Structures are given as C-alpha cells and as structure tokens.
Amino acid sequence: RCLCWLNRLLYLAVDNEILRTNPVENVEYEKKTAPKHKYVTREEMKRILAMPLNEGRAELGRRAFIFSYFTGLAYADIKQLHPCHIGTTAEGRRFIRISRKKTGVEAFIPLHPIAEQILSLYNTTDMHSPVFPLPSRDSIWHEIREIGVILGRHDDLSYHQARHGFGVLLISESVSIESIAKMLSLIHISEPTRH
C-alpha cells in the first residue's frame, strides 16, 4: 500500500519536473483489489419481507428499509420524503421525484408495487409532514442491525446496502444503465456498472 502511494507521488514529481524519472517505476508490488460492494440479495429481501416485527419502531425501520430497497433512496432521502415528492403519470403509474440530499441531483423513480403498499400505510396527504415518521439514523440503525443478525449476516446491514440491492435488482432485470443512473440520481453514468 505504501509503495502504491510512493509511486503516485514520484509520478507527480516527474510530471512537475522535480525528478527526471521515477526511481521505483519497475519495482513490483502487490496492488490492492477494489472492494466488493455489499448489497441485499433477493433471497435476503424475501426473508425480510416475511418477518414482520412486533415493536413499533422496529417495524417502521423494517418497512423503511424495504422501501429503500425498492426505490433506491438513501435513509436521508426517505427521511425528507414528503407527499409533494410523490406523483402520478398520465398512464396512472405513481413515481417519486426528489433531489438527493447528498448530491442535490434529482431522482425520478417509478414505484414498485411493494413500495406503493408501504406508502399506503403512512402519510401521503399532509404536505407539511414527512411520509415516514422516522427517528434519527442512529436509533433506527440498531433495528436494521438486528434484522441483519436475524438474517445471519456477518457484516452490519445498512440502508446503503439496500440502495446497492436496488441497483443490482435493476441490472438483473436488464434495465438500461441510463435509466438506473436517473433512478439512483448518479452523477457518473458508469457508477451502476460497479455493482
């Protein structure tokens, strides 16, 4: 790892004409492989769908997590989702149009029937209140972590993994990369191919 950084710095020195050549250019070193993105699989989602939780906050966290999986929205975006972000096309299909909190890029997401079913349980009329009455991310994180433990996952389950799961789901259904980028409000169109 250190040799990799040293090599980059030396190439910068060569580019800025501080050095004539890179003295470690031909030195062999092990290159780190790119980390594999973790995501929620279809099988895991089927198990999550089949395990309603009794406690109110835990069930709210589970439903918001499922909603994240079927919309690709991050926790911060679900928390700021208001009824005004939900619309209907001329053909009668419902969708979400919202600017992502992280990037400010607008997402246009047709609603999956399971996401619509979850929406019907929460606020879709009061424009001044969010759709989901979510607590802070830290308090809901414990509920999501417990779901991961029940699933037998060795890593902590996260909303980001649900978002990646949505991307993988779309890719497996042969949705175009351009459409996926628009739904996930990605800045670079090459991002979905990393999944």
For the regions a protein language model found, what residue spans apply to each?
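C-terminal catalytic core of tyrosine-transesterase DNA break-rejoin enzymes
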Residues: 15, 66, 70, 76-77, ...
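Conserved small/polar residues in nucleotide/adenosyl-binding loops
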Residues: 187-195
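Basic, Lys/Arg-rich DNA-contacting stretches centered on the C-terminal catalytic core
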Residues: 30-35, 51-52, 56, 76, ...
